[in-house]
């Protein structure tokens, strides 16, 4: 179990991957408004599709892939839950999305980074570049209620942050006596992971007779 934390080593390990300066790889959250996003996409005709991705209660992701022209034409509808739907057969929402009430709507999330996934085996004839799909993390709505894992996590974090602020407001925290708790504006939760490379390392050496 080899954990690589050194950036220089990591770059050598994944040195086979080279970024193409002609391709767009992500759209940072909050950096572009509607017109900025549409202008950026217009400059990259190799991005042919958009994929809205939602996570159900079992942790499975479900996505709907749509031509980029529809996304650009009906941009606002994608953030209002009016553009893309799926049925309950593709998601796990026990006793929520039922057979006779299965419609689930996607709502694109504008508060997170969007990424572009390229298919190197499918080259765009007009540009000579691989065909790209803009992947947008999304929420899932059923009967006007957010029901997906991401929305539950978001509400949980918002609730815990508010309760923590109430709990420590005006109080002295041991080890942080000089910290002005009353001035805390927000509590932000982050998650982290580590990139691991698994290698086979025999624990014993054997002598084999031929």
Please give the residue ranges for each predicted region.
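ATP/Mg2+-dependent ligation/transfer catalytic cores
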Residues: 2-210
């Amino acid at each position: 179990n080899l954990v690589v934390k050194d950036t220089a080593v990591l770059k050598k390990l994944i040195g086979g991957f080279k970024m193409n300066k002609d391709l767009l790889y992500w759209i940072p959250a909050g950096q572009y408004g509607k017109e900025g996003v549409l202008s950026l996409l217009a400059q990259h005709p190799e991005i042919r599709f958009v994929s809205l991705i939602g996570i159900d209660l079992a942790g499975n992701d479900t996505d709907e892939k749509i031509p980029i022209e529809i996304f650009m034409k009906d941009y606002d509808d994608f953030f209002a839950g009016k553009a893309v739907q799926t049925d309950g057969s593709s998601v796990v929402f026990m006793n929520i999305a039922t057979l006779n009430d299965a419609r689930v709507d996607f709502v694109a999330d504008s508060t997170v980074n969007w990424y572009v996934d390229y298919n190197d085996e499918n080259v765009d004839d007009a540009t000579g570049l691989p065909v790209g799909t803009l992947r947008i993390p999304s929420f899932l709505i059923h009967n006007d209620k957010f029901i997906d894992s991401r929305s539950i996590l978001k509400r949980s974090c918002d609730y815990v942050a508010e309760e923590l602020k109430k709990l420590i407001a005006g109080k002295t925290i041991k080890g942080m006596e000089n910290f002005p708790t009353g001035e805390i504006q927000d509590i932000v939760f982050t998650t982290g992971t580590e990139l691991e490379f698994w290698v086979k390392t025999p624990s014993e050496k054997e002598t084999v007779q031929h």
